[in-house]
Amino acid sequence: QASIYDFLNNRKWKTDVYQPNEKIDCSFFLNIDEELGQNVYRASLTIQAARPVYNSTYASPLINFKDDNIVFRYQEFQPLEFNENRVQGNDPVAANLTAVLAYYVNIILGLDYDAFALRAGDVYFKKAQNIVNNAPEGRDVAGWKPFDGVRNRYWLAENLNNNRFALIHDALYTYYRKGMDTFYEDEKAGRLEILNGLNYLNTVQTDNPNSMFMQVFFQGKSNELV
């Protein structure tokens, strides 16, 4: 966990300069489920992130998702390295851990930017797609291909970059920036914009039933929308 913390916090993921209090509230929890061989593990990763709501102490969830199928090689005290131009590195199975972490960092950044400005997260969703396109390949490595299942990293990045799902970005901006951020100043107007954001997502669901993004979004919103 210490190596993951250092990897996530000491690497520069974006070009914008932010104050310490403007950092995204997020957590990554890696749970080792099985040892497959010498220094090779199967694990699950829980990813959580939230966005502060303007003029309140409330943080609205961006994502709360568990990735159940991560296989990687790791030796204690080994530094975690990632090169977006060479995602597979010298050892694809070892590189799979940093590829997964970098992927979700970019997904979180994209969601956060989209929640503040329309389509502002595109650059990060494209970075996530680049990781998918160049993802490590190896025995038991999964989650990067369309045939690995219908609920995986491939499909989440695909949804966020596919123009068929363009209303996702309108929904995120409307829900958070126009809805949640105005809720405490004008509850009626804020609630209306939140509903407008959900209506965008309803259109996405109608046009693309059971998409990966919709599952991820509403899984994170289960308590907020009750």
Q: Where do the PLM segments sit?
A:
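Start-of-domain marker
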Residues: 1-42, 53-55
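Solvent-exposed, acidic/flexible segments
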Residues: 38, 94-98, 102, 187, ...
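Flexible, glycine-rich surface segments
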Residues: 109, 116-214
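Hydrophilic extracytoplasmic domains
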Residues: 217-226
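Acidic/His-rich structured neighborhood in mature extracellular/periplasmic domains
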Residues: 37-158
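Short, mixed-charge aromatic SLiMs
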Residues: 28-31, 129-136, 226
